[in-house]
């Protein structure tokens, strides 16, 4: 019998409902309308978004999604649902899934927990490294939803876990397990989702969190620093983003004589378009063309046992007293 004293809301970014241009357009429109993601003045941004970006990018992105789509849906949704089910089984409390953009929405997740009698909600955004573009966007959505309700639940919000020992251990185990099966590379690159440099200059701690995760992982793996570094991927637009850029770094490593390269994406809690297509396909092609021989993407933590154990411990720690 479940303990319904509190419930857990797992939150990730979201995904299109299907790999069609129309579904991609709906999703990108909601995502790129968020001022946390793109903070340009609306009168300037909206014509660019609706007149240029959505019409051009939606068909292109649809083809990319089609290349990674799984039998049960998008990889992000499939792995997120598996995470929810596994965590609920481990905790024996209600666990709901909500996406910042798309479906199931954060509102749907909160409603599910309410229907199960939860008057206390622990929100776990699955972003290890805090950023205003991701973690804060979750908080905004929750506040907007609860603003409409006369009786709101007691809330606790996990801000980050970039340096949590169980998270670092889970990352390290995923690396050593992968190497046990595939052999060790010449070099390990940690690729994080990028944000505009201006956001960091204005106080977003994301790059500090990414550096700290990389440092702790290197210590945990006992990796010589000349064999490991970090970079930022998924850049779009014309302004400067956090550097070094992943694709530029990968090309440079190959040109320096690195023949076998492994890339992991610690900021992504599940594999998705940005890992399975951008890294595993596009960046692999860049590496091989620049003179590399073997390129591997180390899978994200997804629903592996160490990751679910980390989530369980994180929730248990933050729900003390409930």
Curated annotation (Swiss-Prot):
The record's subcellular location field reads: Cytoplasm
Molecular function terms, GO-annotated: ferrochelatase activity; metal ion binding
Q: What is its EC number?
A: 4.98.1.1
Which parts of the chain are coiled coil?
none
Q: Which UniProt keywords apply?
A: Cytoplasm, Heme biosynthesis, Iron, Lyase, Metal-binding, Porphyrin biosynthesis
| Residues the entry annotates as binding Fe cation | 193, 274
One annotated Gene Ontology cellular component of this protein: cytoplasm
Q: Does the entry feature the keyword Coiled coil, yes or no?
A: no
Pathway it belongs to?
Porphyrin-containing compound metabolism; protoheme biosynthesis; protoheme from protoporphyrin-IX: step 1/1
So what does this one do? Catalyzes the ferrous insertion into protoporphyrin IX.
Q: Which family does it belong to?
A: Belongs to the ferrochelatase family.
Question: Which PANTHER family does the UniProt entry name for this protein?
Answer: FERROCHELATASE, FERROCHELATASE, MITOCHONDRIAL
Its recorded name reads Ferrochelatase
């Amino acid at each position: 019998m479940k303990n319904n004293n509190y419930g857990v809301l797992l939150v990730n970014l979201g995904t299109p409902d299907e790999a069609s241009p129309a579904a991609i357009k709906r999703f990108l429109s909601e995502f790129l309308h968020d001022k946390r993601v793109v903070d340009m003045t609306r009168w300037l941004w909206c014509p660019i978004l609706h007149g240029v970006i959505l019409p051009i990018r939606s068909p292109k992105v649809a083809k990319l999604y089609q290349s990674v789509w799984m039998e049960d849906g998008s990889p992000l949704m499939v792995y997120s649902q598996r995470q929810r089910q596994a965590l609920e089984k481990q905790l024996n409390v209600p666990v709901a899934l909500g996406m910042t953009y798309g479906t199931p929405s954060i509102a749907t997740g909160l409603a599910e927990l309410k229907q199960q009698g939860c008057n206390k909600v622990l929100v776990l955004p699955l972003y290890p490294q805090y950023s205003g573009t991701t973690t804060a966007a979750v908080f905004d959505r929750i506040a907007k939803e609860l603003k409409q309700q006369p009786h709101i639940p007691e809330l606790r919000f996990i801000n980050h876990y970039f340096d949590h020992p169980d998270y670092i251990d889970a990352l390290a185990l995923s690396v050593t397990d992968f190497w046990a099966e595939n052999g060790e590379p010449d070099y390990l690159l940690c690729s994080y989702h990028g944000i505009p440099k201006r956001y960091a200059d204005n106080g977003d701690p994301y790059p500090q969190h990414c550096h700290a995760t990389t440092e702790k992982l290197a210590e945990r793996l006992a990796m010589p620093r000349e064999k490991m570094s970090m970079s930022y991927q998924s850049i779009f637009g014309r302004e400067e983003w956090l550097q070094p850029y992943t694709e530029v770094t990968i090309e440079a490593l190959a040109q320096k004589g690195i023949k076998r390269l492994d890339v992991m994406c610690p900021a992504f809690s599940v594999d998705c378009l940005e890992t399975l297509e951008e890294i595993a396909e596009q960046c692999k092609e860049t590496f091989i063309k620049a003179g590399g021989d073997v390129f591997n993407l180390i899978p994200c933590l997804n629903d592996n046992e160490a990751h679910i154990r980390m989530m369980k411990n994180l929730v248990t720690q933050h729900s003390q007293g409930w």
